[in-house]
Amino acid sequence: MTRSVSFPLFLFAVVLSLSSSLLADDPKPIRREVYEGGKIYDISHRYTPEIPAWESSEGLGKTFLRLAASMKNGSFANVSEMKLSVHSGTHVDAPGHFWDNYYDAGFDTDSLDLQVLNGPALLVDVPRDKNITAEVMESLHIQRGVRRVLFRTSNTDKRLMFKKEFDSSFAGFMTDGAKWLVENTDIKLIGLDYLSFAAFEESPATHRVILKGRDIIPVEALKLDGVEVGTYSLHCLPLRLVGAEGAPTRCILIK
């Protein structure tokens, strides 16, 4: 009697074990921006065909990433290839981006200072539907000694980085705002929430102001929704692209 009861229980255990194994062979990836209940925030955007690209109505497009070698086609491994501008998605600018003499001298993303790219950072809210002018910069009351500032603008509210078509009306720094920052603050890293930290209509001039001294690093296209205003530990690690004036970057905030 005991053996007849045990046998069905044994079969049930085997079936349950096999079912668990089958489920384990079909895992689902977990994608998230917030870790440990808000202790870590991933403020980098995902690279997808729909992410906006500079002056493009089609985003990055489906061809920016392709599977060059496929196991389904007989290859021993899956190998992807990527082709895109170094100023796509969340990225940094190096001095050579708008200064040709700096480009020739080798001021590329490999030369950027990791001590600037990593450390305490202040996240501030910019008055909505405004570009960052000298007046706006003064109104933010950023204290001397603050070296890294992330500027959240109406770009985040409008979710511009989630819209495929490039939007030239994005909020950004005007030239006078950039000059005010250089002359009146100790900021060495600026972060913004669209493809350029500089407003579209004054982009070249504003970039030249910020990059002229080779001591301020712009980080662009940050994902700043869902993060409270305040001070964090910022960690940005650009690809070490020798000879490139920009590089895709993974950035996180730690509370």
Swiss-Prot record:
Its main location: secreted. GO terms for molecular function: arylformamidase activity. One of its GO terms (biological process) is negative regulation of programmed cell death. It comes from the Eukaryota. Residues 1-24 form the signal peptide. Keywords: Extracellular matrix, Plant defense, Secreted, Signal. InterPro entries: KFase/CYL, KFase_sf. It holds the Pfam family Cyclase. Disruption phenotype: No visible phenotype under normal growth conditions, but leaves of mutant plants exhibit a severely increased cell death when exposed to fumonisin B1 or a bacterial pathogen that triggers the defensive hypersensitive cell death. The double mutants cyclase1 and cyclase2 are embryonic lethal. It is found in: Secreted, Extracellular space, Extracellular matrix. Transmembrane segments: none annotated. SUPFAM superfamilies: Putative cyclase. Induction: Induced by salicylate. One of its GO terms (cellular component) is endoplasmic reticulum. Belongs to the Cyclase 1 superfamily. Acts as a negative regulator of fumonisin B1- and pathogen-induced programmed cell death (PCD), and regulates pathogen-induced symptom development. May function redundantly with CYCLASE2 for normal plant growth, development and viability. This is Cyclase-like protein 1. The gene is CYCLASE1.
